[in-house]
Amino acid sequence: MRKWALSCALLLVLLLTTLPDPAKKLQVNAEESSDEVGDFPKVEEKLGAVPHGLSTDSEVVQRESESISRKTLRNSAEKFEFQAEVSRLMDIIINSLYSNKDIFLRELISNASDALDKIRFLALTDKEVMGEGDTAKLEIQIKLDKENKILSIRDRGVGMTKEDLIKNLGTIAKSGTSAFVEKMQTGGDLNLIGQFGVGFYSVYLVADYVEVVSKHNDDKQYVWESKADGSFAISEDTWNEPLGRGTEIKLHLRDEAKEYLEEGKLKDLVKKYSEFINFPIYLWATKEVDVEVPADEEESNEEEESTTETTEEEETEDDEEKKPKTKTVKETTTEWELLNDMKAVWLRSPKEVTEEEYAKFYHSLAKDFGDDKPMSWSHFSAEGDVEFKALLFVPPKAPHDLYESYYNANKSNLKLYVRRVFISDEFDDLLPKYLSFLMGIVDSDTLPLNVSREMLQQHSSLKTIKKKLIRKALDMIRKLAEEDPDEYSNKEKTDDEKSAMEEKKGQYAKFWNEFGKSVKLGIIEDATNRNRLAKLLRFESSKSDGKLVSLDEYISRMKSGQKDIFYLTGSSKEQLEKSPFLEQLTKKNYEVIYFTDPVDEYLMQYLMDYEDKKFQNVSKEGLKLGKDSKLKDLKESFKELTDWWKKALDTEGIDSVKISNRLHNTPCVVVTSKYGWSSNMEKIMQAQTLSDASKQAYMRGKRVLEINPRHPIIKELRDKVAQDSDSEGLKQTARLVYQTALMESGFNLPDPKDFASSIYRSVQKSLDLSPDAAVEEEEEVEEPEVEEKESAKQEAEEPEHEQYDKDEL
């Protein structure tokens, strides 16, 4: 009986091997028609088919065999030309990022996550948009077709209409392209491609043909396809499996990109770049499992032949006791494997999260996948009337347009979640503009879910959240300074603490170089936190030796009896170091703060005092350096000169001439009134395109000429005035000295020609030249008319290309 069964089994196997293989036939047909447009099956023909997300590799190949091997745009599709900016951008991406092809997967997953965020938000007010069954599952699926070299990434997000496909994939905001190109030309980190909104086009690093299948609830299912050759096509999709809703991107990989068909490679990339995406990412992965199968018939027969003969009774007993013979074999199966099973970082306890996990999460959040870690972070929970969890980061670098669009940008770097549901990143009221460089997440359990963004923005809880976020943000920045050994002494630290702090050496200086302007803007805009922000200020000074110092450090070095904090504004440290306003201050060992940023002029209009110390601009009136016992006598001695000089400069707008207490080597300087503009501020305002000239004249304030009574020039002028106060030459000399002082004090000369003429007259006098010495006239020589004609003839005979070269030059 068993031998008969064995014979039947062998015959069946033989018959099966002679049958044709349908899969191979399909493959041959696909290869033969690779350059032709076939008839694609209609959607109606596929009703009842297994959902695409759950089908096996062989079913996918069979279902799509007519389209997957073709890499030409369908003849029936509506064709478009790429916008010029897009074509230029794709060339840049392909040529510049070729060595970092991995980023394409990161960008596609990031886009899929954004689409899922959008549909989840829409579902808050309309649950029907989510759909039912598999369509309602908010997840990202990655699938491989090694045979046809296709990598597919699918999401069940909001999807795209036909118009969306044209707008989002065929055109691009010029500003995004320009910013990306500028970043590339300045040697910036091109890993930041996602920040410019051009990440999708990185697919052409690995694919030479791309299909984007998308279904939006408000439109039919469409296919967008392109070979990156300057054009793309869009057609209604009647051959792919209905998506229900969402987008599937099919990348037909280049030969040199086969590594992205390896499951291990994709798993590594997801772990590296997308581990903290807020939606599950699944890979259709192969897996080996142990399976119990019946033992082969041949093995059973061999065992029978080797056994000794038994009696009929023994045989019956053995049959009753004998169990089916099985063996364990390895079997390959495919199933969906979850690649990102990490819990949202901000929901975990700060003690459970490692530095590496914080850094990875920051890179995912900021779409910045460079090597730089965030400078600092603050992870905290708030309890009470308003409960929320938050995670804030200080980026390693300032965004490329942080201050260019400071007052116009509406988008925030903070993502607002309500009960783990992403709501928006456009709530600019969560943080003030001066802290807009911070990145992070706020997740509230108090805010309502089922209201519009506009209503949510007016919710009273937001004010409480904002207040706590500001306080935590400023504490985070303060701690960044405290942990920097360049900022504070290590004397009271243990060896382990010193070692840890060495790693953060120079961190606050780096922060200040990137975001110092934001701290200054905060002092201008936020009166409530002005003192907290003032503690974060850093600057160079006359005693800092190139290092940055704080106001607290300055105060700790103030001289006994010094009541004011001295500062000077200008365009550069080098210019300020040579300023005549520092002469007496330096001689008497006073420290002076250098402010060289244009925003510093505005800053000091709001920062009037710090720790009960007033700020004093040393280029303005009111400088006090202690009592001078001889000052009264000097004023009396030079009274005739100061009165005469004031009259001599009557047309120059000088309010008064006074004895100075701030000069040592310089004969005189021009200072402004306490509330008037400094010379530096005048230049800043004059550079404004739409500045008001009448306002400038008013805000300029009074100017005072301060003279150095100990300088030989001033003493000689006093004597000359006493001898002949009506001398025109003396008046010209006095005006020249004033104009020189005006220029040395940082002001622009109102009449440079008059100043130059005065200089030339002085030079003439020093060379013993007569004031009436005339300039020698040049003899006029008439050029022969023949030469002009020759010249014209020569020009006419010049070749056209030479003339073109001249014009170009």
Swiss-Prot record:
PROSITE patterns: ER_TARGET, HSP90. A motif (Prevents secretion from ER) lies at residues 806-809. Residues 293-329, 766-809 are annotated as: Disordered. It comes from the Eukaryota. Induction: Accumulates rapidly in leaves upon heat shock treatment and during infection by a pathogen. Gene3D superfamilies: 3.30.230.80, 3.40.50.11260, Heat shock protein 90, C-terminal domain, Histidine kinase-like ATPase, C-terminal domain. GO terms for molecular function: ATP binding; ATP hydrolysis activity; ATP-dependent protein folding chaperone; unfolded protein binding. Keywords: ATP-binding, Calcium, Chaperone, Endoplasmic reticulum, Glycoprotein, Nucleotide-binding, Signal. InterPro entries: HATPase_C_sf, Heat_shock_protein_90_CS, HSP90_C, Hsp90_fam, Hsp90_N, Ribosomal_Su5_D2-typ_SF. The record marks 453 as: Important for ATP hydrolysis. Belongs to the heat shock protein 90 family. This is Endoplasmin homolog. It comes from Hordeum vulgare (Barley).
